[in-house]
Regions:
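PLP-dependent class I/II
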Residues: 1-148
Length: 148
């Protein structure tokens, strides 16, 4: 399903192994996908810029709001996720903290412990939602932290 078209940039030392799986995921690309790839690689260089700016705005808004509440955050430069340390003085059990938050404020984050033992005490959230949704989630988080 989907476009089934892919491109890998990797150090030569890895390509021999990568090609073993990559070739089966993207071979026999349909004509429409091939034309789309040509367009993207020749004329689409800046197509993602408006969305990139939007994601940066969302990320920075969340970081500002959450750090003001005491969360520790290392600013992400990759995908659209934030991994934030739960402030001292709050339940450090990420599952318990977020279960209570979800029950009281109807907002879902992912417990850091879901990513292994070193994730305990952290929460993960996505900023792939609209700014309106993000603002509402941050408002509810602020209310929750004040009430806890």
């Amino acid at each position: 399903t989907g476009w089934r078209l892919g491109l890998i940039f990797a150090p030569a030392v890895f390509t021999a192994q990568l090609i073993k799986s990559h070739q089966y995921l993207v071979t026999a690309a349909n004509t429409m996908a091939q034309h789309a790839a040509v367009e993207a690689l020749t004329a689409g260089k800046n197509d993602a810029e408006p969305m990139k700016k939007e994601y940066i705005q969302r990320r920075d808004y969340i970081i500002e709001k959450m750090t003001a509440l005491g969360f520790e955050i290392i600013k992400p430069d990759g995908a659209f996720y934030i991994f934030a340390k739960i402030p001292a003085g709050y339940n450090q059990d990420s599952f318990a903290f977020l279960k209570d938050f979800a029950q009281k404020k109807a907002v879902a984050f992912i417990p850091g412990a879901a990513f292994g033992r070193y994730g305990e005490g952290y929460v993960r959230l996505s900023y792939a939602a609209s700014m309106e949704t993000i603002k509402e989630a941050m408002k509810r988080l602020e209310e929750y932290m004040r009430e806890a």
